[in-house]
Amino acid sequence: MKQYLDLCQRIVDQGVWVENERTGKRCLTVINADLTYDVANNQFPLVTTRKSFWKAAVAELLGYIRGYDNAEDFRKLGTKTWDANANLNDAWLNNPYRKGEDDMGRVYGVQGRAWAKPDGGHIDQLRKIVDDLTRGVDDRGEILNFYNPGEFHMGCLRPCMYSHHFSLLDDTLYLNSTQRSCDVPLGLNFNMVQVYVFLAIMAQITGKKPGQAFHKIVNAHIYEDQLELMRDVQLKREPLQAPTFHINPEIKSLEDLETWVTLDDFWVEGYEHHDPIRYPFSV
C-alpha cells in the first residue's frame, strides 16, 4: 500500500502535464515506476484508502486467460470493464473490423491464446508457458505477450499491461509484468491485483511455490479531472491493514480456469477500507 501511495504522491509533486491525444485531456505524468508484491507471504496489494472492487479485477484476468474478445463474456464473469471501450469508442465503432455490439477485437487474451502466425494458424502462448513450468522448464522466454502492432487496427484498445514474463528458480515461480501506460487513480488498483493474482494462480496450477511479482510501469499518470480527488481526498486518508487473498485449492489446471472456475473460487479476508471514490474514466 505504501508503494502505491508513494507513486500517487510522486505524480502529484513531480508530474509533468502532457496532452493526451486519444482522450483529449491533460495528464500529470511521471516516467518509470517499479512495484513489488510479496506473493510468497500473501501480502495482497489491495488499496485501502478507498474501496477497491478486487473481484472485477480478478474477473478481467480470468477473461484474458480464457482468450475472450467480447464485453458480454466479461460481464458474465463479473466485470463491466470492457463495456465502454467496446461500445463507446468512436474510432472502434467506425472500424470495419468491429463485428458488432460488445466486440473488442483482437486484444489482450486473444493475443495470449491465439497469436496469428504469418504462415497461418495460431500460437497459444499461455498453454506453452503452463506446460513448460509444469515440467519444471524455464527457457528464459516464458513470456505472455499481448503487444502485437501488426493487429492494433483490429482491436478497440492497445494493451496497457502488455507483457508477463515468468521465471523459475528451483521450485519458486517469479513474475515480471510490464505496463506501458497506467491511469493510476482508476487502473492501478486493478493492475496490482492482477499481477499478484496471476503469479499466485500460475504457481498453483503448475505446482510451484509463488515468489515475488515485479510490476514495471513506464508512463504513470493522473488525468486532470482526477487530480483534485487524488490530492485532496485519497492522499489525505490513512492506509489500513492489508487483507489476505485466497484461491480455491481445487483449481489445479489451465483447463479448470477455462471451464468451471468463477469468482466464488477467490476470496479476501480482513479487507478494511475507506469510502469509495468515483474517479472519472477516460475512454
Swiss-Prot record:
(6R)-5,10-methylene-5,6,7,8-tetrahydrofolate binds at residues 183, 282. It catalyses: dUMP + (6R)-5,10-methylene-5,6,7,8-tetrahydrofolate = 7,8-dihydrofolate + dTMP. Gene3D superfamilies: Thymidylate synthase/dCMP hydroxymethylase domain. CDD domains: TS_Pyrimidine_HMase. It comes from the Bacteria. Its main location: cytoplasm. The active site is at 160 (nucleophile). Keywords: Cytoplasm, Methyltransferase, Nucleotide biosynthesis, Transferase. GO terms for biological process: dTMP biosynthetic process; dTTP biosynthetic process; methylation. It is an enzyme of class 2 (transferase). Pathway: Pyrimidine metabolism; dTTP biosynthesis. DUMP binds at residues 22, 180-183, 191, 221-223. Pfam families: Thymidylat_synt. Its EC number is 2.1.1.45. The keyword Methyltransferase applies. Signal peptide: none annotated. It is found in: Cytoplasm. One of its GO terms (cellular component) is cytosol. SUPFAM superfamilies: Thymidylate synthase/dCMP hydroxymethylase. GO terms for molecular function: thymidylate synthase activity. Homodimer. NCBIfam families: PRK01827.1-4, thym_sym. Catalyzes the reductive methylation of 2'-deoxyuridine-5'-monophosphate (dUMP) to 2'-deoxythymidine-5'-monophosphate (dTMP) while utilizing 5,10-methylenetetrahydrofolate (mTHF) as the methyl donor and reductant in the reaction, yielding dihydrofolate (DHF) as a by-product. This enzymatic reaction provides an intracellular de novo source of dTMP, an essential precursor for DNA biosynthesis. Belongs to the thymidylate synthase family. Bacterial-type ThyA subfamily. This is Thymidylate synthase. It comes from Vibrio parahaemolyticus serotype O3:K6 (strain RIMD 2210633).
